[in-house]
Amino acid sequence: MKGMCKMKKKAALHNLGCKVNAYETEAMQELLEQNGYEIVPFKEGADVYIINTCTVTNVADRKSRQMLHKARKMNPDAVVVATGCYVQARGEDIDPCVDIVVGNNKKKDLIAILDEYYNAQHKVKKELLDINHEKEYEEMQVTHTAEHTRAYIKVQDGCNQFCSYCIIPYARGRVRSRNLEHVLEEVRTLAASGYKEVVLTGIHLSSYGIDTGESLLELIQKVHEIDGIKRIRLGSLEPRIITEEFASSIAVLPKMCPHFHLSLQSGCNATLKRMNRRYSAEEYMEKCDLLRKYFHNPALTTDVIVGFPGETQEEFAESMDFVDRVNFYETHIFKYSRRAGTKAAVMPDQIPEEIKSERSAKMIELGHRKQKAYEERLLGTTQEVLMEEAVETEDGIYQVGHTKEYVKIGLKTEENLSNQLKNVKIEDTKQIIH
């Protein structure tokens, strides 16, 4: 048996944060399985607890700390491993309940780090690199995922943007793109295992290839050629990648899902400038218009921050008006979270929490109205749905999956349709699941 363990040890993992983190957690789980560990649910007793942390907001920091303490409380004798963005950004300031700290570019070495820890008679172990100088992509691979129909594939790490509110470039380092052929190998493996949809994801997906002379468009076109894959979906994109060439080129690919998450953050130019977002609201709207030019009724989704430092009532109203005019399918609202070490953290005119909450509630209500309007346009249409699971409701059993636009749809039947593509006529709003 590989690895350090003579007896089969139990390991439990918990993921916090984005799809990139989720991918890395699944890759670490595979490493543990390959080296003789038994994977158990986090709520069960384990010999090793691994928490992949997040630091995107203060709430994420708090949840990360809570999970680390929960692991220690569940088994005081267990090895508690902290990895991910929270520990990378915090450096040496890590809670004493943690036995091992693994930086964001050392996750592939998890087994060796555990071996060394045990061989060193349980001395506290820290594996943190100065990630800002890291130039190599950390190659990890997933052959199966928690979902049995859709697989997320990490193709890129790091970010060079340095938006004034964001701590992630400090936790993830500069842009590093995965070898294109390695991505294709993983897609082929997943296709052979029966996965029908792949989602290309990264910390700053739009930057894929800027360090290797390749491009995201080239990667999409290569993935499209792989047999077995029926759908290609993209993670969050920067608006600037949506050019006439990009939109027209992906629109001719039958497997391409017309679901685009374009980060907005604010619809007010003055706020965007303070955020260092590098585009105007007008430019953003042009990108949305381009996508609607080449795709029929695409689902456009976004993120919006309310209560950014200096955001006046007039600026907020301008942002609300812009979101209203874009007609997003989904709008994810975040109250500005002050992150130490960022430019925004020391900006004047910080907004009180009660005002942030008021603005958040208004933006959420607007988002819900826009989502309802988009969904109502689907009534009477027939949509291709990738079935994923059975859901029991008061109205009976529904087989549930997602359209290419990522609208969750139910078909009332007891027949198991998991991982099948079915054309479903949407006759009632009850079929649209939230």
Model-identified regions with their sequence ranges:
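Short flexible coil/turn linkers enriched for glycine and charged/polar residues
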Residues: A146-T149, C159-N160, M256, S266, ...
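Flexible glycine-/small-residue-rich
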Residues: N15, G202, S236, L264-S266, ...
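Conserved SAM/AdoMet-binding glycine-rich loop
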Residues: V80-V81, A89, A192-Q313
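Alpha-helix N-cap/loop-to-helix initiation residues
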Residues: N21, T57-A60, V87, P239, ...
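Terminal RNA-binding accessory module
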Residues: V346-H434
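Radical SAM enzyme [4Fe-4S]-AdoMet core and its adjacent flexible, acidic
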Residues: C18, G209-H224, G228, M275, ...
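Proteins enriched for Cys/Gly/acidic motifs involved in redox and nucleic-acid/cofactor modification
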Residues: K2-S207, E245, I250, F260, ...
